[in-house]
Amino acid sequence: MTEYNGYVTDETIEGADDGPLAGKTVAVKDNISTEGVRTTCGSAMLEDYVPPYDATVVERLKDAGATIPGKTNMDEFGMGTTTETSAFGAVENPAAEGRVPGGSSGGSAAVVAAGDADLALGSDTGGSIRCPAAFCGVVGIKPTYGLVSRYGLIAYANSLEQIGPIAPSVEGAAELLDVIAGPDEHDATTQEAPEADGSYAAAADGDVDGLSIGVPTELLDGADEAVVETFWDAMDDLEAQGASYHEVDLPSVEHAVEAYYVIAMSEASSNLARFDGVRYGQSGGYDGNWNESFANAREQGFGEEVKRRILLGTYALSAGYHDKYYKKAQDARAWVKQDFDEALDDADVLASPTMPVPPMKRGESLDDPLTMYLADANTTPVNLANLPAISVPAGETDDGLPVGLQLVGPAFGERQIIRAGSALA
């Protein structure tokens, strides 16, 4: 284990003798299946679960010669923004003492920031790669939905989540994306990206001369003053390298957080129904009837945040409320996607602070879930729109806290955001 509690399991998995990742260590988030090595999702419910197969991305890592040093800590079932809801203890931030590392892939970002792994895989449902990358001062890519296989990812919200890379540099993240991207017969949502020149890593050339950047004003409104100041400094840096920027409007993002949480919680209530102590998960005992056994397993196995989201999701899907909540959330999702598509007609990429706040103090948001949800305001819209995004270090506040800059591209426009991001990191 690391001093930052970045790993849940530090069991080494060896890859092939050679390949593009030979000699490199790639940590894997603990909701991604690894054959013969336990995969807990940060939950007591799956404390002893050992998958009988590898996720597709794990197979691709091994084939590429990577060594997996362990499974990284995470918010339970990916539900959190701080990596404090794990049943295996909170993760500390190597880049900001006493602050959270972000979530839910906080362990992956922390081990990369601390130098305990060269690279890492996370998963991003509403910002779970980009948030910890921003808070830990590293790079994280949320790929276009369908670019990377989700086979072997223990699902939280199927229509939103993607597996992606975390690295110290944009080039390193792009090299990892080159390995894991591509169609998979085991995941019908994957698709072939349109043909393009060169690898993702080759796009990390730092050339932003002539790049047009749209800045959505709505994603700056209400952001912390120090974050906004650091963001504009980074934008000035890009401008000095030949890029230009202008304001764009995304009026729909005002409703993105609530739409995201209705959809994500609804999908979670369905996905997590399988963890009942009989099909999957720790047993609730065999005293009493089946309902009591199921209830005991879920009461003991799930943490408070997971229970909250399951209950809210079940409510949103219940008879009489489906049209009131879930259908309206899906309508808002379509509006968000339309707004992004229109904004990207007038810009090559969009830019905003990754997170509207710097890393919070540990323990600060645990008793205030609404504050934690609202911190996702800049990242969740991208998942609703199924677009690619990257978080790169923009600098630090006067207090020395890391700030991330998010770049969003059109569908399968990973090379555009990688090229833009590599001018900064």
Curated annotation (Swiss-Prot):
Its EC number is 6.3.5.7. Gene3D superfamilies: Amidase signature (AS) domain. The keyword ATP-binding applies. It catalyses: L-glutamyl-tRNA(Gln) + L-glutamine + ATP + H2O = L-glutaminyl-tRNA(Gln) + L-glutamate + ADP + phosphate + H(+). The keyword Protein biosynthesis applies. The active site is at K29, S104, S128. Coiled coil: none annotated. GO terms for cellular component: glutamyl-tRNA(Gln) amidotransferase complex. It holds the Pfam family Amidase. GO terms for molecular function: ATP binding; glutaminyl-tRNA synthase (glutamine-hydrolyzing) activity. HAMAP family: GatA (MF_00120). Belongs to the amidase family. GatA subfamily. Allows the formation of correctly charged Gln-tRNA(Gln) through the transamidation of misacylated Glu-tRNA(Gln) in organisms which lack glutaminyl-tRNA synthetase. The reaction takes place in the presence of glutamine and ATP through an activated gamma-phospho-Glu-tRNA(Gln). This is Glutamyl-tRNA(Gln) amidotransferase subunit A. It comes from Haloarcula marismortui (strain ATCC 43049 / DSM 3752 / JCM 8966 / VKM B-1809). The gene is gatA.
